C-alpha cells in the first residue's frame, strides 16, 4: 500500500498542470481519488477533520500525511473551525511521531501539485538520512516500511 498515486516511470508526485482537463477534474473534486474512494490510501487514524496516513513505501521512515476531509486546494479555503482543526492535526501527528522516533527535526511540506486535495506531509529527519542538507526529494525511490512499523505508528497515534 503506497500513500500516493504513482506518476510517470513510478515517480511519486509531479505536476499535472500541463494536462488542463485532468487538472480541472482533480481540482474540482470530480476526479479526486481521495473523494472518489471516500478516504485516502494508507489510513492509520481517522480524526474528526482529517485522516492521518502512511504506507509501506515512503520517502523516509516514520513519514505521515495528514489529509483534510474537505476537498479544498489551499488551507485558507477551509472554514475557520476546520482550518484550525487541520493545523492542530498536523501538529498532533508531528508531535506523536517525534515522541516515537526521536528524530533530530520534523519537516513539513504542502504541495498539491499532483493531488490538489489539501494534505500536509510530515517528515521526521534523522542524522545521516539520505536527504541531509536538503528537502525531501519525491523523485527518489521510496523506502520500505514494515507492517510492524506501521502498527507502531498507528498505536502511537491512537494512544491517549
What are these regions (language model features)?
Residues 1-160:
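HIT superfamily nucleotide-processing domains
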Amino acid at each position: 500500500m503506497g500513500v500516493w498515486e504513482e506518476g510517470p516511470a513510478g515517480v511519486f508526485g509531479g505536476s499535472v498542470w500541463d494536462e488542463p482537463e485532468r487538472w480541472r477534474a482533480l481540482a474540482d473534486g470530480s476526479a479526486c481519488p481521495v473523494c472518489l474512494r471516500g478516504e485516502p490510501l494508507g489510513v492509520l487514524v481517522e480524526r474528526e477533520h482529517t485522516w492521518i496516513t502512511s504506507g509501506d513505501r515512503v520517502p523516509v521512515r516514520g513519514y505521515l500525511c495528514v489529509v483534510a476531509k474537505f476537498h479544498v486546494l489551499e488551507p485558507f479555503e477551509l472554514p475557520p473551525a476546520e482550518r484550525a482543526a487541520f493545523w492542530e492535526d498536523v501538529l498532533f501527528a508531528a508531535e506523536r511521531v517525534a515522541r516515537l522516533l526521536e528524530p533530530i527535526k520534523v519537516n513539513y511540506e504542502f504541495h498539491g501539485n499532483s493531488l490538489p486535495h489539501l494534505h500536509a506531509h510530515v517528515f521526521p529527519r534523522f542524522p545521516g538520512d539520505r536527504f541531509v542538507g536538503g528537502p525531501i526529494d519525491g523523485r527518489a525511490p521510496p523506502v520500505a516500511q514494515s507492517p510492524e512499523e506501521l502498527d507502531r505508528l498507528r498505536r502511537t497515534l491512537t494512544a491517549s
